[in-house]
C-alpha cells in the first residue's frame, strides 16, 4: 500500500475530529473515526453523518465509524487524536495497551495539560516513552468549513522530517486542504493553545463595544505574548508568524464561529462564565487554557498582561471592565 493510501484513524468524534475525518477521507483513502459514545457511533454509522455537530454533511465512502477502541487503533499505523485537552491524557492511557512499534501518533488537540501547564508532547512522552514518532496538526480551521470542503491551510509539525513528509502526503489535498510542514513542535503547540486565551480577550473587548481598534491591538499584543513565552521554551519565533500562530489567532479572534470569541463576548456583556459556557454547549478550550497559560508564564518568568487579566476575570472574580482598565492603564513602553 502506498504512503498516500495508508489508513488513518481519528480518535475523537466531536465537530473537529469528524471534520478532519471527512477531509482526510475525501481522497478515497481508508479513514476510521472513533468516538467514546457507542450509541452516537452507531447513529453516525447508520446515518452517514454527525447530525449533532455537522448536520447535513455526508460522510465520504472511505470513512468508517468505529466504536471499539482496540479495533480502531489496530486498523491504522497513524493515529490522529482530536479530543478536548482535559481528556487528552486519559485517551493516551486508554490506547497505550493497544500500541505497537509501527504506530505513529499525531494530535490536533489545542491546549496544555490540565493542572500542570505542560505541553501535550511532554505528556505523551512521559506516558509512552520516545519510541513512537510524534506530530501535531494545528492552524486556522473551523470544523464546519473544513467539513464542507472549503479551502483550508494548516501546519503539521514533527521533529522527524521523514514522518512529516509521509503524513503530509497522506492528508494533503490540493483541491481544498493544504498542509505545510514545520519542525517546531513547541511553537506550533503553544500557538494553538494560547490563541484561545487571546480570543477570549478579543471577544470581551467586542462585547463591551470597544471596536475594531481595540480588537486589533489585542491580537497584535497577543501574538507578542505568545512569542515571548514560546521563545522562553525553545520555540522558533518565526513559527508564530505562520498558520499555527498568527493565522490561527486572527481567525479565532475575529469570527463568531469561534467558541472562545463568543464566550469572551458574553463575558464582556456581563454574563458569568458558567452561564456562557452552558449557552455555547461545547468545550471552550480557552477557559481551561487560561489557568495553565498563566501558570506556565509565571513559571517561566514571562510577562503576559492580557493572559493575566483574563485569568483574573475567570478565576479571581475581576470585572471585565476593570480588566480592560488595567490593561489600558499599564505604563507606556517601547514596542
Swiss-Prot record:
Gene3D superfamilies reported in the protein's UniProt record: N-(1-d-carboxylethyl)-l-norvaline Dehydrogenase, domain 2 (1.10.1040.10), NAD(P)-binding Rossmann-like Domain (3.40.50.720)
Keywords (A to Z) from UniProt: Cytoplasm, Lipid biosynthesis, Lipid metabolism, NAD, NADP, Nucleotide-binding, Oxidoreductase, Phospholipid biosynthesis, Phospholipid metabolism
Record's subcellular location: Cytoplasm
Biological process annotations from GO: carbohydrate metabolic process; glycerol-3-phosphate biosynthetic process; glycerol-3-phosphate catabolic process; glycerophospholipid biosynthetic process
UniProt pathway annotation: Membrane lipid metabolism; glycerophospholipid metabolism
Gene Ontology MF, one: glycerol-3-phosphate dehydrogenase [NAD(P)+] activity
EC number: 1.1.1.94
Protein name in UniProt: Glycerol-3-phosphate dehydrogenase [NAD(P)+]
UniProt source species: Mannheimia succiniciproducens (strain KCTC 0769BP / MBEL55E)
Major localization listed first in the record, in broad terms: cytoplasm
UniProt-listed Pfam families: NAD_Gly3P_dh_C, NAD_Gly3P_dh_N
Cellular compartments per GO CC: cytosol
Gene transcribed to yield this protein: gpsA
Active site: 195 (proton acceptor)
Binding site for NADPH: 15-16, 36, 110, 143, 259, 283, 285
Purpose of the protein: Catalyzes the reduction of the glycolytic intermediate dihydroxyacetone phosphate (DHAP) to sn-glycerol 3-phosphate (G3P), the key precursor for phospholipid synthesis.
Annotated catalysed reactions: sn-glycerol 3-phosphate + NAD(+) = dihydroxyacetone phosphate + NADH + H(+); sn-glycerol 3-phosphate + NADP(+) = dihydroxyacetone phosphate + NADPH + H(+)
Family: Belongs to the NAD-dependent glycerol-3-phosphate dehydrogenase family.
Record-listed sn-glycerol 3-phosphate binding positions: 110, 139, 141, 195, 248, 258-260
Amino acid at each position: 500500500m502506498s504512503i498516500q493510501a495508508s489508513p488513518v484513524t481519528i480518535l475523537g468524534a466531536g465537530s473537529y475530529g469528524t471534520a478532519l475525518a471527512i477531509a482526510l477521507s475525501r481522497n478515497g483513502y481508508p479513514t476510521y473515526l472513533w468516538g467514546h459514545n457507542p450509541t452516537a457511533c452507531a447513529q453516525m454509522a447508520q446515518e452517514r453523518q454527525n447530525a449533532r455537530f455537522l448536520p447535513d454533511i455526508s460522510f465520504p465512502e472511505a470513512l468508517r465509524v468505529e466504536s471499539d477502541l482496540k479495533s480502531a487503533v489496530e486498523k491504522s499505523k497513524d493515529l490522529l487524536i482530536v479530543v478536548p485537552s482535559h481528556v487528552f491524557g486519559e485517551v493516551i492511557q486508554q490506547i497505550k495497551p493497544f500500541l505497537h512499534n509501527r504506530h505513529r501518533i499525531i494530535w490536533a488537540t489545542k491546549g496544555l495539560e490540565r493542572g500542570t501547564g505542560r505541553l501535550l508532547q511532554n505528556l505523551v512522552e512521559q506516558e509512552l516513552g520516545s519510541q513512537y514518532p510524534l506530530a501535531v496538526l494545528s492552524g486556522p480551521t473551523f470544523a464546519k468549513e473544513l467539513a464542507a470542503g472549503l479551502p483550508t491551510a494548516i501546519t503539521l509539525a514533527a521533529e522527524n522530517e521523514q514522518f512529516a513528509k509521509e503524513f503530509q502526503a497522506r492528508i494533503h489535498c490540493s483541491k481544498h486542504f493544504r498542509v505545510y510542514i514545520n519542525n517546531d513542535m513547541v511553537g506550533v503547540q503553544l500557538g494553538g493553545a494560547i490563541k484561545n486565551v487571546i480570543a477570549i480577550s478579543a471577544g470581551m473587548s467586542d462585547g463591551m463595544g470597544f471596536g475594531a481598534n481595540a480588537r486589533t491591538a489585542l491580537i497584535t499584543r497577543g501574538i507578542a505574548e505568545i512569542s515571548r513565552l514560546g521563545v522562553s521554551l525553545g520555540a522558533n519565533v518565526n513559527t508564530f508568524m505562520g498558520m499555527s500562530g498568527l493565522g490561527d489567532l486572527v481567525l479565532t479572534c475575529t469570527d463568531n464561529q469561534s467558541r472562545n470569541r463568543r464566550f469572551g463576548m458574553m463575558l464582556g456583556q456581563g454574563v458569568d462564565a458558567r452561564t456562557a459556557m452552558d449557552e455555547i454547549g461545547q468545550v471552550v478550550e480557552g477557559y481551561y487554557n487560561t489557568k495553565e497559560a498563566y501558570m506556565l508564564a509565571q513559571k517561566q518568568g514571562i510577562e503576559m498582561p492580557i493572559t493575566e487579566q483574563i485569568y483574573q476575570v475567570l478565576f479571581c472574580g475581576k470585572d471585565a471592565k476593570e480588566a480592560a482598565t488595567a490593561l489600558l492603564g499599564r505604563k507606556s513602553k517601547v514596542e
